[in-house]
Amino acid sequence: MNQETALKIKQELSHVKLLVCTPCYGGQCYTGYLRSTVGLVQLLTQLGIEHEIYTLDSESLITRARNSMSARFIGDESFTHLLFIDADITYNPQTVLRLLMSKKQVCGACYPKKVLNWDK
């Protein structure tokens, strides 16, 4: 990312405080998720975007875990954005910036199935 683009993004997202939530049943996450999230933290830090990574490993039901994480977001009015990422997903940190810059109230992103059926 060049300096001009970084400055534009920094200005556009200066108000953002992002809570990244990942339910990690059994305290486990995939290495691809870890690499992606470390990259996201580096990118957000470089751009001066406030953020927090929140994992929950003590809940076996994903819906209940997400509800608990949503309560954390709602309970802290300093957060402006909530992002759920599953612990088995690899993603491009730049995609998170595009989602934040979309200015939509709710948005999502596609990701491939865990196994590709090459015969189809």
PLM regions with names:
Residues 1-60, 64:
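N-proximal low-complexity "stem/linker" segments adjacent to membrane-targeting elements
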Residues 16-18, 79-80, 104:
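Local beta-strand N-terminus motif with an aromatic residue
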Residues 25-27, 89, 113-114:
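Residue-level marker for beta-strand->alpha-helix junctions and adjacent short loops that shape enzyme
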Residues 39-42, 71, 101:
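Short, well-ordered alpha-helices that flank and scaffold nucleotide-derived cofactor binding pockets
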Residues 47, 72-76, 102:
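Alpha-helix C-cap/termination motif
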Residues 62-75:
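Short, conserved alpha-helix that lines the donor NDP-sugar binding/gating region
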Residues 77-92:
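Short beta-strand-to-loop acidic/aromatic patch adjacent to the donor-nucleotide binding site
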Residues 92-120:
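Conserved catalytic core of nucleotide-sugar-dependent glycosyltransferases
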